[in-house]
């Protein structure tokens, strides 16, 4: 049985699709088996692009911007964790920054996870090539099982 589950979240409704599956899976085991769920938020350090006329230049986030983003991600994870704790689940939260797939794999190692449960946006064809797939990268690089959950049809990101 899985005792430490990592659930990466991106703040979207599609990204939350794995939560209900994990809640159902874990609720059948608690309290017989102690299961710890870690909700992970990854801040990708994408640059802003400033456009002036026909010229553009990449601009890094300021420390204040990163601090604000980190706080918003932490608030979201804590709010999500609180709603799950009402079901008697043990929930932790964690925020990192960097390449999303790399950070997910690193966090799984750090917490000694038995399972990574994540949602897939269901992109295919040219959209997958253009946008890449964090889920694919995690699935093919992980040393532990990865549960991929596709969001229900019609789920809209907010």
Place the predicted regions along the sequence by residue.
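Small/aliphatic-rich secondary-structure junction motif
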Residues: 1-59, 154
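Gly/Ser-rich helix-loop-strand patches that form or flank binding pockets
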Residues: 3-4, 9, 13, 106-158
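Hydrophobic alpha-helical membrane-association signature
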Residues: 18-21, 73-76, 100
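Structural beta-alpha unit
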Residues: 24, 28, 79-116, 153-158
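Redox- and metal-dependent alpha/beta enzyme cores, enriched for Fe-S-associated oxidoreductases
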Residues: 31, 42-45, 68-73, 82
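A structural micro-motif
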Residues: 35, 89-91, 144
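General small-molecule cofactor/ligand-binding pocket signal
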Residues: 38-40, 92-96, 147
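A short acidic, glycine-rich active-site loop
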Residues: 59-75
């Amino acid at each position: 049985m899985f005792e430490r589950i990592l659930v990466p979240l991106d703040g979207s409704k599609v990204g939350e699709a794995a939560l209900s599956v994990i809640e159902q899976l874990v609720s059948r085991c608690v309290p017989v088996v102690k299961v710890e769920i870690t909700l992970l938020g990854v801040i990708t350090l994408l640059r802003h692009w400033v456009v002036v006329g026909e010229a553009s230049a990449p601009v890094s986030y300021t420390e204040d911007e990163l601090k604000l983003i980190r706080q918003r991600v932490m608030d979201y994870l804590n709010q999500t964790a609180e709603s799950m704790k009402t079901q008697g689940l043990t929930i932790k939260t964690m925020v990192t920054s960097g390449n999303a797939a790399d950070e997910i794999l690193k966090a799984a190692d750090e917490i000694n996870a038995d399972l990574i449960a994540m949602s897939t946006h269901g992109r295919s064809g040219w959209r997958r090539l253009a946008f890449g797939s964090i889920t694919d990268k995690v699935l093919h690089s992980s040393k532990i099982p990865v549960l991929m959950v596709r969001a229900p049809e019609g789920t809209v990101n907010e």
